[in-house]
Every structure is written in structure tokens, then in C-alpha cells.
Amino acid sequence: MKMILGRKIGMIQSFLEDGRRIPVTIIQAEPNVVLENKTQEKNGYVATKVGFQQIEEKKLNKPQKGYFKKIKTDAFKHTKEFRNVSGYNVGDKILVDIFNSGDKVDAQAITKGKGFTGAIKRWNFKVGPLGHGAGYPHRYQGSISFGRGGSQGQRVPKGQKMSGHYGHELVTISNLTVVSIELEKNLILVKGSVPGPVNSLVLLKTTVKSKKQVDPIKLSDPEAIARAIKEKEEQARLALEAKKAEAHQKAEAEKEAKKQEMLAKQKAAEEKQKAEAEKNEQPTATAEEAPAKTDDNATEKKEENNGGNQ
């Protein structure tokens, strides 16, 4: 089985020689580097682990740093184990030329997240009457329980289709046809759509449902395709830069908020220390003044006693 990790660049449309228009998804699959081979004797299963998108070591967490230090290789943003793939040694590179025009592949990726959605959008339920006298919410999903009560209890069955989180799940699109390969730019053009947003991770692998071989696809205007690909690459690059800038701005804002919080705590501690110092500096009775006050009090009490005896 053939597999490769790539990055979704975007979608374009192209024309075949017979005039038909087809949708095309551009996937940039940089060389996948083989990191290690899992064996039955050592690991209990057979697999090939690859790395995709080389990054700086400072962007890794401690477990990732430890792993790449252990295998003595460069750091990669994504790592994945390929099952049923053999014939590669550690350090080998898997390129886009493992596929040819006309091959059938499966594309696996995480879909766009839609957040919390209603049952009509999530499960394609029927919309209620939209007239003014409908009498209940127009997009209400209806009853979620069953049972008549009494001896037959009413309850909500497991797996009931209801409102909830929609999207951001692993989806596989089967039987996509490879349109063309551009080895110099590490590009794979696939007929049809692929899940996920721009710059998302995509796994392409040989399809498991269809063994039918399709003739190589011939495009009518390769130059127009090249221009469209270049435009989509630029859009993907700008989107990636905007995402990085937003993340950097968010990190700077958090850093500034922490700094202001530390300054506020430091100022409060200084004010508290100053108040305690002022409290300690207040004048107190000396040792010489204390006996004098005691004598005055004793004289006053003696005079009061004498007045009472008279």
C-alpha cells in the first residue's frame, strides 16, 4: 500500500481535453522522511514511522524533544505510522512520484469545525412549518424520547440524534482520482474535494474499495492550471502567515497581561510594606514617662480615697 502525508493548498477547476470541467484539490506533499521501522519481534507489529514538515526544536514539548533525541534525527511537526508499508530504510524519503495520474486514492483529514449546531444542520432534520400559526419553534428537532409511560417507561435512547458539536472529526473520502503529479513542487492534484481547511494535514493512501485502474487524465490547458496553482499557493501562504501573526499577537497580549498583573501585585506589596512601616514608626511611651504616669495615677487615686473618708 502507498501512503504519503501532505498539506491542503486549496481547490481549483480545470478542463479536460474533451471540454469537461472537473474540480481539483491541490495537495502539497513535502518529502516524508522515514524515522523508524517497527518490527514484529521488537514492537509486536509491523509499521513504518515517518515525519512531515520539519520545524525548529524549540517549538517541541519535552516528550517530543526526547523522542527525536533518542532516534537522533531532525524535528518534525507531524509524525505518523504507516501500516502495510514496507521496503523503506531509516532516512529514506517518500516522494509524490509513488502515485501516477489515474490512480485511485483515499483522502483522510479532519473536517472543519462548525461548533455547537442544531439538529437540522447537524442531522438534516426536516424544518417545521414556517407560518405565523405554527405554534412551536420552527427549527425544533421534535420528541427525543419513546415509550408510553406506566409499565413502559419513557426514556431517551442511546445515540439519539440531537443538537451538539458538529464537525472537527476524522473523515475519509474514497475513490478519488489522481489528476497529475508535479515532482519539482511536490504537488499532487486530486479530482474532487478533500476534507479540512486550507493548510490542514491530509493523508493520501491507495484506495481499499476499488481496484479499477483509470487511464491518465489529460488536461486541456496545463499553463492555466500552473497559474491557478501558483495563485492558490500564494493564498495558502498568506493564510498561514496571518495565522502565525494572530498567534504571535495573542501570545504578546497574554505576556503583557501577565506583566501588568505582576506589576499590580508588586505595587500592592509595596503599599502594604509601606503601611506596616508607618504603623511601626508611630511614637510610643518611653521607659521614663511610664513611671511618671503611674505615679500620677496613684496620686489621683489617693486623693479620691481621702475625699471619700472625709
Swiss-Prot record:
Pfam families: Ribosomal_L3
GO CC list: cytosolic large ribosomal subunit
Residue pairs linked by disulfide bridges in the UniProt entry: none
InterPro entries: Ribosomal_uL3, Ribosomal_uL3_bac/org-type, Ribosomal_uL3_CS, Transl_B-barrel_sf
GO MF terms held by the record: rRNA binding; structural constituent of ribosome
Complex and partners: Part of the 50S ribosomal subunit. Forms a cluster with proteins L14 and L19.
HAMAP family membership: Ribosomal_uL3_B
Similarity comment: family membership: Belongs to the universal ribosomal protein uL3 family.
Protein name: Large ribosomal subunit protein uL3
